[in-house]
Curated annotation (Swiss-Prot):
Coiled coil: none annotated. One of its GO terms (molecular function) is site-specific recombinase activity. One of its GO terms (biological process) is symbiont entry into host cell. This is Putative prophage phiRv2 integrase. Induction: A possible member of the dormancy regulon. Induced in response to reduced oxygen tension (hypoxia). It is hoped that this regulon will give insight into the latent, or dormant phase of infection. Keywords: DNA integration, DNA recombination, DNA-binding, Viral genome integration, Virus entry into host cell. The keyword DNA-binding applies.
Length: 375
């Protein structure tokens, strides 16, 4: 709920209108504290009437801090959070992530606490002891709590959001990413089992996400046009997998394949991918019709990274390595965002859309990097 900032000057109390059109009334009590009406009002006259009642109570010496607060509804945080989670229009994986955050980090402290009783001090105490060893989980937990309380504010269940810790939603990176070198990528690729060598090549040189690669099908590869089309992704939900859309709208994209990769991808399609447009490029080890489980790939990748002397390298770091390689060609940030399928509101405001056709130039320059390495 965003305020317009318009305040009405009055002899007693204050009235302000929200962007929603509703009105809020508040006043300073005889004890010097500011009191806010327990709910907002459809009409300004109703807000004025509430203030008139409070002024009359003060004049008649009938006032108390509880005056006018009797009709404020109460709601335990746990009950409200469950409803909040059910009503959110979010992807299954995000919902599962929020569920885990609530169960593991938030509900143990706040489940039975009334929303009105969650104070900034209570939030600070909770934050000080929550997921201290896992900064990302800690930041996500705080962000979720803040989002739920912000909705409670919009629902007029609380007067203000108690989540006010500056920077708490941002995690300081513990794992410092060191991109793989071309030599390391070559070693890792060769150390992988044959059916999954192309996975490493495409994860790095095309900078693709794990879920995009494991849902990639024969129909998505255009060798003649030298393009990989990303239209779907797969996510782990419980014990199974679910095909969904890419992580963001920008994730739906055509990625130009560096020309030097075409022979390897063509060979992979010929030797390791079943016939048919719907055949997965990188299926399960035991079933060509099932998606590849992360744990199965990790077992192979961990051995390969050890051979390259890079025990610190994660599968997702291959994507980061690819971004660094693409950046080294002189690609602009906007072009990199297009190639990576990454977009944020802030970036959209700061940078123009990537120039059409430049992605193929970037891909060609990537191949030149590889050719120079071989010389």
């Amino acid at each position: 709920m965003t305020q317009t900032g318009k305040r009405q000057r009055r002899k007693f109390g204050r009235i302000r209108q929200f962007n929603s059109g509703r009105w809020q009334a508040s006043y300073t009590g005889p004890d010097g504290r500011v009191y806010i009406a327990p709910k907002t009002f459809n009409a300004k006259i109703d807000a004025e009437a509430w203030l008139t009642d409070r002024r009359r109570e003060i004049d008649r010496q009938l006032w108390s801090p509880a005056s006018g607060q009797e009709d404020r509804p109460g709601a335990p945080f746990g009950e409200y959070a469950e409803g909040w989670l059910k009503q959110r229009g979010i992807k299954d994986r995000t919902r599962a992530h929020y569920r885990k955050l609530l169960d593991n980090h938030i509900l143990a402290t706040f489940a039975d606490t009334d929303l009105r009783d969650i104070t900034p001090a209570a939030v600070r105490r909770w934050y000080a002891t929550t997921a201290v060893g896992t900064p990302t989980m800690r930041a996500h937990s705080y962000s979720l709590l803040r989002a739920i309380m912000q909705t409670a504010l919009a629902d007029d269940l609380i007067d203000s959001n108690p989540c006010r810790i500056s920077g708490a939603s941002t995690a300081r990176r513990v794992h410092k990413i060191r991109p793989a070198t071309l030599d390391e990528l070559e070693t890792i690729t060769k150390a992988m089992p044959d059916p999954y060598q192309a996975f490493v090549l495409m994860a790095a040189w095309l900078a693709m996400r794990y879920g995009e690669l494991t849902e990639l099908r024969r129909k998505d590869i255009d060798l003649h046009g030298e393009v990989a089309r990303v239209r779907r992704a797969v996510v782990r939900v419980g014990e199974g997998f679910k095909v969904t859309t890419p992580k963001s709208d920008a994730g739906v994209r055509d990625i130009s394949i560096p020309p030097h990769l075409i022979p390897a991808i063509e060979d992979h399609l010929h030797k390791h991918v079943n016939p048919g447009r719907e055949s997965l490029l990188f299926p399960s080890v035991n079933d060509p019709n099932r998606h590849l489980a992360p744990s199965a790939l990790y077992r192979m990748f961990y051995k390969a990274r050890k051979a390259a002397g890079r025990p610190d390298l994660r599968v997702h770091d291959l994507r980061h390595s690819g971004a660094v390689l693409a950046a080294s060609t002189g690609a602009t940030l906007a072009e990199l965002m297009q190639r990576l399928g990454h977009s944020t509101a802030g970036a959209a405001l700061r940078y123009q859309h990537a120039a059409k056709g430049r992605d193929r130039e970037i891909a060609a320059l990537l191949s030149k990097l590889a050719e120079n390495q071989e010389m």
